Structures are given as C-alpha cells and as structure tokens.
Amino acid sequence: MTDIDSSRRKFLISSAAGISGLVIAQSSLAGTVTNLLDPGSPLMLPENFSPSVWFTMQSSGETTIHVFRQELGQHIGTAFAQIIAEELELDWSKVSIDYPSVDAAIVAETGVQLTGGSASVLQSFDPLSRAAAVARQFLIDSGADILGSEPSDCYAENSYVIDPIFDQRISYGQILAQTVIDHKIQPEELAEVQLKRRPDYKIIGQPAHALDIEEKVNGKARYGIDARVPNMVFGKASLAPTRLGSTI
C-alpha cells in the first residue's frame, strides 16, 4: 500500500505554513498568515490547534480528548477517549486526555458541566460518538480529495484514510498538515450520521491502559480537595461525641 507523502499539496490556500488542526464542536478564532499569492490579502486560518468542546486533532497525529466531567477515580476520561477513538478510528497510542476548567461557553455548548449519579458515560456516549463519526467523515472526504479518490471508495482505520481500490493511504496528521477543516458540526449532521455497529467495535469493550493513571499514582492529579484560594481557611464541623448528644 502506498503512503502519500506529506509534502504533497492539493489544497493550495489552506496549506500555507503547514499549521492546521481539526476543531470539533466549536468554531475557533482566526489567525493570519501571509498570502504568498497576494501579500496584501492575508489568509485566514484557525489558530493552531485551538481547544474544542469535545476533542482537538493535530497535524502531529496526536488527538486530545477534552473531558468536561469531574474525575473522581472512576476513569471517565479514559472511557470518553475510548468512545471518541472508536468512532473516529484513532490510533489509541496517540490519544491523550485533559480536564478543562469550567467555562461559560462550554456550558452553553454542552448544556451542563457536572458529575453525579454515575451518568457521565450514559449521558455522553451518544453525543461523543456522533461528533466523532461526523469528524471521521470530514477526514475521509478531505483525505480522498488529496488521494484523488472518491470518498465512497475510502474508509478510515487506525488514524489513516485508506483507498483499497488504488492501494494507497494517507494519515490523519498528513491530511491536517495539508488542509484546514474548520467546520462547525450542525445538529442535522449529528442526527443523520451513521454510527458503527457494536460487533465492529475495536476499542470499546477491550482492556485499555487508563490514560491518566500516572498522575493519579504519583500525586500530580488535582482533585477538589486540593483547591487553594488566597486567604483560605480550614473549618471543621463540631459535633457531639455521642449519637444523641446535646445540640451545640
């Protein structure tokens, strides 16, 4: 199978400087680079790898999953990553997670930013799956264009778009180095996208190394009890020493 070299350029405008990323569920701010074809008219490109609501993909091939729930030791971050990696057909070795701070824009997009009732995976499975599936199709469309193939002839696997007819493939990283995919997913796209069948799952249901296990073991992970603010004081409830003790 032929790997397409990342120096190939079929998207002239969006290939400038080779900085690009796939931002899902949130339009990014725009940065400027010089338009070499018309120096007086700068090209508008998304900021390099601006965080999105659900995940951010980079031309390095890395994907960061943004977990907008509180981690209490139940490994919801790894679960979210597995859900997205499954539909997006990611190379699991290049997936990481982070836990963004509470933000009004994020709450407006997701509707809620809390954890409770053991409902994180239950409530997030479908929206995460659909966002990843739509993104996969974006990548297939762009990858097929670079390969000179028909999108319907291509499929995604292990962070590659593959054309089995002409025996060639291109990695997600190479695609993002050659073009900018700056499209805000629309509700109708989420509703209509075709999700994978359970028998086709490769990541969900399989043993997986917790992506944040090192931080939890070495003490680097920060929990609510670790929070500190200026002039913070500590308090303790004063209780009667016996169950039926007098009110204090």
At which residue positions do the language-model features occur?
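Cofactor-binding beta-sheet edge motifs in enzyme active sites
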Residues: 2-24, 31-248
